[in-house]
Swiss-Prot record:
Job description of the protein: Involved in the biosynthesis of monoterpene natural products related to camphor. Catalayzes the oxidation of (+)-borneol to (+)-camphor. Shows absolute selectivity towards (+)-borneol. Catalyzes the oxidation of (+)-isoborneol to (-)-camphor. Shows absolute selectivity towards (+)-isoborneol.
Keywords: NAD, Oxidoreductase
GO MF: (+)-borneol dehydrogenase activity; xanthoxin dehydrogenase (NAD+) activity
GO terms for cellular component: cytosol
Organism for this UniProt entry: Salvia officinalis
Protein name (database record): (+)-borneol dehydrogenase 2
Pfam family, one: adh_short_C2
Family statement drawn from the similarity comment of this UniProt entry: Belongs to the short-chain dehydrogenases/reductases (SDR) family.
Length: 283
């Protein structure tokens, strides 16, 4: 007698959701960007990694077997010529650009007192997190508009929708990424181009460690961070991973999201939908 389980596809038989697509991932050499690159390749995409971390980018290409479907290009997202060159390199190598992932970002130095915040540090965060995203959108659009299709995805944060989760520059920059996402989606919709962003809750990466309060730190900062994040999470019993964020990006890049644009996809376990101060449902 047949059962429902007999109709469930094994992981090996699941469709490659990005087969034949060409993607460019900024900040793709490490952290969330690396996870996105790995999952894109798993789903059949050809990928160009754009990063300032040359050694790590080359290492990742070698990890993926040195395939002709993976490439690295040095790119500082604050320099428009670098981004233009990375986009053109991708098109020259793979023939087109279907997916642009603006992942490169920094959190900036912790600074609990606005009176002490150095403007040079503020400017650096905005240069990378906002200017870099805008330049990526601009040059992706340059290729995608004539093709009348494409998907632009930017990595934002839960700090895109609420305050008190990070330094002023970081929070302001992530609000700006959300604003750019909505506005660019409004312009590019007529060209068949989708523009979205992904806003995860805290993930254990070197970038995120800067957000851990000094009072919560011991000798093992990674464990401290994971414990702090778990204690403040809304969804319990599940730890957010870089792969979870990458899965959200794959969804937005795929045809499964073909009518999704202007969206801020929250990968936060309901964190931003909860008033943590009231704690109405806490025992």
């Amino acid at each position: 007698m047949a059962t429902g389980a007999a109709n469930v596809e094994s992981p090996q038989s699941l469709p490659l959701r990005l087969l034949g697509r060409v993607a460019l991932v900024t900040g793709g050499s490490s952290g969330i960007g690396e996870s996105i690159v790995l999952l894109f390749r798993k789903h059949g995409a050809k990928v160009c990694i754009a990063d300032v971390q040359d050694n790590q980018g080359q290492r990742l290409c070698e990890t993926l077997g040195g395939s002709s479907d993976i490439a690295f290009c040095h790119c500082d997202v604050t320099i428009e010529d670098d981004v233009k060159r990375a986009v053109d390199f991708t098109v020259d190598k793979f023939g087109t650009l279907d997916i642009m992932v603006n992942n490169a970002g920094v959190s900036g130095p912790p600074c609990p007192d606005i009176r002490d915040f150095e403007l040079s540090a503020f400017d650096r965060v905005f240069d990378i997190n906002v200017r870099g995203v805008f330049i990526g959108m601009k040059h992706a659009a340059r290729i995608m508009i004539p093709a009348k299709k494409g998907s632009i995805i930017s990595i934002s944060s839960v700090a895109s929708t609420m305050g008190g989760l990070g330094p002023h520059a970081y929070t302001g920059s992530k609000h700006a990424v959300l604003g750019l996402t909505k506005n660019v989606a409004a312009e590019l919709g007529k060209h068949g181009i989708r523009v979205n962003c992904v806003s995860p809750y805290a993930v254990a990466t070197s970038l995120a460690l800067a957000h851990l309060p000094e009072a919560e730190r011991t000798e093992d900062t990674w464990d401290d961070f994971r414990r702090f994040v778990a204690d403040n999470a809304n969804l319990q019993g599940v730890e957010l991973t870089m792969e979870d964020v990458a899965n959200a990006v794959v969804f937005l890049a795929s045809d499964e999201a073909r009518y999704v644009s202007g969206m801020n996809l929250m990968v936060d376990g309901g964190f931003t939908s909860t008033n943590h101060a009231l704690q109405v449902f806490r025992p």
